[in-house]
């Protein structure tokens, strides 16, 4: 019996060892945080532009002070020396594009933090995966972080957090196989902008079925038709994972009766998925209205929210502005061939 018990224990240990070796360190959550893997954690910031091991905080406030974006805080750090916050940010001149990160894969972006100055609509972030010439993500920085009106508003969700005083955080997992390049362009022709940032990523094997992260930015100002296109021209197999909308109301009254529609896999006149109203899609109801105060009420949850309301005087007055998000984290919209998403302008 002892021999059998020992053999059984050895088999269990061997199985656990193989199981641990197969874990790649992706898809982290409270349920697997205890698990070890061979994934390597790296981080890129102005204090370590390459993310290389043992290369952080090397800027010298004296030797590097005249080098562009190498010792931007040298005046404050000159008496402290190397390793004391010598280069915590970068400056981006008007009409200049700066490479925030360039990473050799395989691996995945796991978290991004940044706090950019300037007009957020005039700063464009782009993500290039592998050998792409055209970016998979091209979006004003404010809209990418659910702050399209250029005004701070706190947001607490699983995918995006906006924290005091203007801290943008992204938790979308973004795998890549060969390499990743992230750039930021300042399209303001007159003003320099500054950004503090940290891009946290892992170097690890990526599953064969892993898709690449994409984001489209579209603006209708004003919306001249009954439908606003959220995304279009998407070909191939994928899944739609979320929407952020900055919506301005140019007349008085309720504005959110429009239905969101998902046209997929050859749908023409009629979609496969059709919602029941704008506030319904963003997981609210009955005009987002607090029935006691008779006012719109902000809310921010892990999956959906109306986190921003910029009010003139009066509950249904013209020129109110809203920020809303809806993440399909547990309910991605899967498609095999193509996808187009629209939302109606109806009040």
Spell out what each predicted region is.
Residues 1-3:
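N-terminal secretory signal peptides that target proteins for export/translocation
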Residues 5-14:
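Sec-dependent N-terminal signal peptides
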Residues 16-20:
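Sec/Tat signal peptide C-region and signal peptidase I cleavage site
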Residues 21-347:
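Beta-strand-centric surfaces of beta-sandwich/beta-rich domains
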């Amino acid at each position: 019996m002892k021999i059998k018990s020992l053999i059984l224990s050895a088999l269990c240990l061997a199985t656990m060892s193989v199981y641990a070796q197969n874990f790649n360190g992706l898809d982290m959550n409270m349920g697997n945080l205890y698990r070890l893997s061979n994934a390597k954690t790296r981080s890129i910031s102005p204090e370590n532009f390459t993310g290389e091991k043992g290369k952080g905080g090397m800027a010298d406030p004296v030797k590097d002070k005249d080098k562009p974006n190498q010792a931007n805080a040298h005046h404050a750090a000159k008496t402290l020396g190397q390793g004391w916050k010598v280069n915590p940010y970068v400056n981006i001149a008007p009409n200049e594009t700066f490479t925030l990160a360039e990473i050799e894969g395989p691996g995945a972006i796991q978290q991004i933090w940044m706090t950019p100055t300037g007009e957020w609509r005039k700063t464009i972030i782009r993500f290039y995966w592998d050998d792409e010439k055209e970016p998979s993500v091209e979006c004003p920085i404010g809209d990418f972080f659910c702050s399209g009106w250029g005004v701070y508003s706190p947001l607490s969700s699983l995918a995006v957090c906006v924290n005091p005083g203007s801290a943008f955080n992204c938790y979308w997992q973004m795998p890549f196989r060969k390499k990743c390049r992230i750039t930021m362009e300042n399209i303001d022709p007159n003003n320099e902008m500054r950004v503090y940032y940290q891009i946290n990523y892992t170097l690890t094997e990526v599953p064969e079925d892993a898709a690449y992260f994409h984001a489209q930015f579209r603006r209708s100002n004003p919306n001249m038709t009954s439908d606003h296109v959220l995304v279009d021209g998407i070909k191939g197999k994928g899944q739609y994972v979320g929407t952020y909308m900055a919506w301005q109301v140019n007349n008085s009254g309720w504005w959110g009766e429009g239905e969101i529609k998902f046209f997929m896999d050859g749908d023409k006149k009629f979609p496969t998925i059709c919602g029941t109203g704008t506030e319904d899609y963003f997981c609210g109801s009955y005009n987002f209205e607090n029935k006691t105060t008779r006012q719109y009420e902000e809310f921010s949850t892990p999956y959906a929210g109306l986190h921003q309301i910029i009010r003139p005087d009066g509950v249904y007055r013209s020129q109110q502005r809203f920020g809303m998000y809806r993440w399909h984290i547990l309910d991605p919209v899967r498609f095999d061939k193509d996808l187009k998403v629209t939302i109606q302008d109806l009040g």
